Amino acid sequence: GAASYVAAKKAQKAAKRPNDDQRGVLVNKESNIEQIPVIYGERRVGGVRVFVSTDGTKLIAGGLTRWQSGWEPESEVYDTVSDTPTNEYLYIALVLAEGEVESITDLEINELPFTHAKYSGLISYNVYLRNVNEFWTADHRLRGVAFLGMRFKWDEEAFAGVPDVTALVKGKKLYDPRTASTAWSDNPALCIRDYLTNTRYGKGLAVSAIDDVALGIAATKCDDSVTEYTGGATGKLFTCNAVLDTSKTLFDNLNILLLGCRGFLPYSQGQYRLKIDGSSASQFAFTTDHIIGGISIQGESKSDKYNRVTVKFPNPDANWQPDTAIWPAAGSTEETAYLAADGVLLQEEIELDTITNYYQARDLARILLLRSRNGITCGIKVTSEALQLE
């Protein structure tokens, strides 16, 4: 509909970035003021080193071996205790995301699996999924965040410097109003609900401000099973696998979530009602009895009209590096017809941070292109009866 087209155009503009956010989420940073991202769905990410220390001694306290720095690792055999610091061990607290998350697995060290033979006996780590009531120590809280506590034993053949670490994170657990339960999910509607209501990193809206009936309908539509391509496998209509940068505005992050599921969020009668764009039967017939103001019509413009759309997305099949999906395909009947009609290449490129499936990315490229070529909008002032078209 027209409302979803306008919302999509705003989100498209936000998706045109000069920087490469998708590649940046795999980078390790060192800071105590860096923003902590929110992970929805599943993504491979780097993290923020909030604690880095070297040591070569250990303490024995209460019969339990503890790292000198205060970490409490899983049980393992240690070298002989030394009275002289050797800086043989590097300790890192690597914050990955806001907690609580479902799981942190499949660690890679300098782009090699943690289990690689070159790292044998050199690395140990603890996983902290973190709910808001947990903390590391009384002095080092890290409360409410998901992080790794890691120890590296120095080996010049294995490590040329401070190791870069990435992990596969299944992110936030989400409340589902359809089942009144909380569990991990990659459903975009549930992600949007969480972002709108979360008081730590989201908008902090009261639950009463969300129409959970409408949101449940949207969530069910996102879960619809579709065939990804002729003769291919089936999958969900929409999923959300996003790393949200919490330094961005709430509006920008919400638009990122909405664009990935072709959603829009009208506000009516004191509540937000999530809608997922799609074909539907006509719901209202306008007559002159409903029109109480002037009519304005805006047609498509060359600056907003495309004959090729490229969507950049993080691809798990390419080790989560940025990949592209293009519509229409080069040499296709559609491309030939559009180029003949326009006489020049009109291309658009956007980044999608929520989609990690090639076929979902390609389908969204198709939808955005078709909308741009049928972008006539009409504005009229009407009676309150038209509110049912929200």
Task: Tell where the protein language model's regions lie, with residue ranges.
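Polar, S/T/G-rich
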Residues: A3-C261, S268, K312-P314, N319-Q321, ...
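Surface-exposed fibrous attachment elements
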Residues: A14-A15, S279-A281, K305
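Short, low-complexity, polar/charged sequence segments that are solvent-exposed and flexible
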Residues: T57-L59, P113-F114, F286, I292-I295, ...
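Hydrophobic residues embedded in beta-strands of well-ordered beta-sheets
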Residues: G270-R273
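Short, charged/polar, Gly/Pro-enriched secondary-structure boundary elements
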Residues: S279-D289
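Metal-dependent DNA phosphodiester-chemistry modules and their immediately adjacent helices/loops
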Residues: H290-S332
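Short alpha-helix capping/helix-loop boundary micro-motifs
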Residues: I376-E385
